[in-house]
């Protein structure tokens, strides 16, 4: 057994190095704390699961039953042909290595494997075993125990609601066994047959060493946890359906950082869990399959404070790649105490907390993420998007770089931003991809900086006390298309521009589904608002200083408006807001004064750090204009000032004037620049 375990760990490390160089798990039992419950960012384990887009870990082979011991079950009796096994009182005990073919029905008995260090294969061929007092299939001692499901057969294991720990092979103190299929040795489930596990007492399938499921169709209905491999849990080319009160798929070894990992590859998983869907004490990799996970009753349920009900969870790093994922979770849908890496796949997510959360770095380089409902969309110490197609609907922030542990960790449900202070190391970096955000809070929110050098970002923030853009230190815009619309009075502009940008106030609140057009000689950008907006920031590489841009709203559009950016059609019937001569940096028009977010605020400048101010809490003297400031009516390409009364700023000299009859505000003095 030790030699096999060494091989398994070495193979995991080798596969990780060979695969993850090209591309990268944890919940406690109700009565035990795992190391990951202690929170904080954890480093990745040296040995980890195999990774994304990998071929199957092995080639399945048909089992040759020549020379096998034949065990035939018939009600309360058992017949045995061959050596290595004996039966007494409905209990079959296997004491030698070899292959044992099992068929028939056992009304109230069990199979026990007690073969020392020898490898044992139990081939189930239409077997149904019911045991009212313990595990129907109990691997007490073996080198490696293999349960082979013969092709085309259906097999069932069913236990009772209570166990009797009265023999020398069981332990009431250690609660062993505590699963319908329980192994104290490395356990492999394989074969082209089917296995149904009805676990009425506690857990469905448990291995205290490694668990590997290949090629099989396995269904588990468990009172507590579903499928547990303590040292590691590998599922490859399998169909697994789990309904359970605890975690559906898990690995829990917290004493060895090379163990406790989960690898799921080329499989179809349907998991309905009262707690976590997939949880790994260290790292997890999920790839190339179809994964439907409902945890904690789904996104509309409220889990208890001490219950973790996440979709996919890792204690160190979590890597997700190709595959189709449907996640409906009351807690975080995707969570790691270390880093989360998403390189591909299609995701449909509804969650009562974060769609994807990393205490460390959250990186998206590909895939399609449709986050239909969340508290926060993407949250991490840093958030980096270099590719992919992302849609976020959130009641709070869309993308949030906060830094540290947000308090949700491996324990219970954690709403809100309870990160430990991240400072300027927190960052949102966007170099590619397409992002659309409809946020009840801030659209893009960083406790440190925001940097955008490419991609397309369309944001609508509908919260009255929030804005589309919110940052602590800086927002550098050096490429890409940005449209950030805000309904409230906390709108902010980029602080550093390497391409022209427009900051406009509409003079009214535009409703969702309203079109906004920015048109110049060389471009015609049309956006569809996904929420209410009273102001917006727009920038694109096509904008040029000194050129004229017309801004219109309303009207109709004949083409597609995927992700808020319209294409393939024509805009007509809009109301002209203004014709603006662009500055080389920021051109502001029609802004009204008021509270801004962190950073370079529309209509007022930076929030000062006063007696109670830290850039987050109001404090100090709000009469100072700060960046983009100026007294009312003062010329300035950066836009309006912050008058002592907190009222409107002045008009930008380059802003022009709106056409007659289309004045956005009631009077010119209300048109802050």
Question: Where in the sequence are the language-model features?
Answer:
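N-terminal secretory signal peptides that target proteins for export/translocation
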Residues: 1-3
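A composition-driven surface/loop motif
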Residues: 5-12, 16-673
């Amino acid at each position: 057994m030790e030699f096999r375990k060494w091989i398994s760990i070495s193979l995991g490390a080798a596969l990780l190095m060979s695969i993850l160089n090209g591309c990268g798990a944890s919940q406690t039992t109700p009565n035990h704390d795992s190391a990951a419950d202690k929170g904080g960012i954890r480093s990745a384990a040296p040995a980890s699961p195999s990774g994304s887009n990998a071929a199957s870990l092995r080639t399945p082979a048909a089992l040759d039953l020549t020379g096998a011991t034949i065990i035939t079950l018939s009600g309360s009796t058992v017949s045995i042909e061959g050596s290595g096994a004996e039966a007494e009182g409905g209990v079959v005990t296997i004491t030698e290595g070899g292959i044992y073919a099992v068929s028939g029905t056992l009304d109230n008995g069990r199979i026990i494997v007690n073969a020392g260090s020898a490898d044992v294969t139990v081939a189930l061929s239409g077997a149904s075993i019911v045991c009212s007092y313990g595990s129907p299939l109990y691997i007490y001692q073996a080198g490696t125990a293999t349960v082979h499901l013969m092709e085309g057969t259906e097999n069932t294991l069913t236990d009772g609601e209570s166990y009797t720990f009265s023999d020398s092979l069981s332990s009431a103190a250690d609660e062993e066994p505590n699963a319908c299929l329980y192994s104290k040795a490395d356990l492999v489930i394989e074969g082209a047959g089917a296995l149904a596990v009805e676990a009425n007492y506690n857990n469905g399938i448990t291995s205290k060493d490694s668990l590997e499921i290949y090629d099989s169709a396995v269904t588990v209905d468990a009172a507590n946890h579903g499928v547990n491999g303590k040292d590691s849990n590998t599922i490859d080319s399998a169909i697994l359906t789990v309904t359970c009160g605890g975690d559906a798929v898990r690995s829990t070894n917290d004493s060895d950082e090379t163990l406790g990992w989960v690898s799921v590859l080329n499989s179809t998983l349907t998991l309905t869990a009262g707690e976590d869907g997939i949880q790994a004490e260290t790292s997890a990799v999920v790839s190339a399959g179809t994964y439907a996970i409902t945890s904690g009753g789904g996104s509309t349920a409220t889990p208890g404070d001490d219950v973790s009900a996440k979709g996919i969870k890792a204690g160190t790093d979590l890597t997700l790649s190709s595959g189709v994922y449907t996640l409906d979770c009351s807690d975080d849908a995707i969570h790691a105490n270390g880093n989360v890496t998403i390189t591909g796949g299609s995701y449909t997510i509804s969650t009562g907390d974060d769609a994807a959360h990393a205490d460390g770095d959250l990186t998206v380089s590909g895939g399609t993420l449709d986050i239909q409902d969340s508290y926060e969309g993407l949250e991490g110490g840093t958030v980096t998007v270099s590719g992919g197609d992302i849609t976020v609907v959130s009641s709070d922030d869309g993308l949030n770089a906060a830094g540290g542990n947000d308090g949700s960790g491996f324990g219970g449900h954690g709403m809100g931003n309870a990160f430990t202070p991240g400072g300027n190391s927190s960052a949102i970096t966007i170099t590619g991809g397409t992002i659309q955000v409809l946020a009840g809070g801030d659209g893009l929110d960083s406790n440190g900086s925001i940097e955008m050098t490419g991609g397309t970002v369309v944001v609508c923030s509908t919260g009255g006390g929030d804005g589309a853009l919110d940052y602590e230190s800086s927002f550098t815009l050096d490429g890409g298309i940005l449209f950030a619309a805000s309904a409230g009075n906390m709108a902010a502009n980029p602080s550093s521009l390497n391409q022209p940008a427009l900051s406009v106030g509409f003079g009214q609140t535009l409703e969702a589904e309203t079109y906004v057009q920015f048109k110049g000689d060389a471009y015609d950008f049309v956006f569809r608002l996904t929420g209410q907006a009273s102001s917006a920031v727009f920038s694109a590489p096509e904008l040029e200083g000194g050129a004229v841009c017309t801004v219109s709203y309303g009207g109709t559009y004949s083409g597609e408006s995927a992700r808020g950016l319209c294409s393939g059609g024509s805009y007509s019937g809009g109301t002209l807001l203004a014709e603006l001569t662009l500055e080389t940096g920021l051109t502001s028009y029609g802004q009204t004064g008021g509270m801004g977010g962190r950073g370079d605020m529309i209509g007022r400048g930076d929030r000062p750090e006063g007696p109670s101010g830290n850039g987050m809490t109001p404090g100090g003297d709000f009469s100072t204009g700060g960046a983009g400031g100026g007294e009312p009516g003062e010329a300035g390409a950066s836009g309006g000032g912050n008058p002592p009364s907190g009222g409107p700023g002045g008009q930008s000299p380059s802003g022009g004037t709106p056409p007659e009859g289309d004045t956005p505000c009631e009077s010119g003095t209300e048109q802050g620049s």
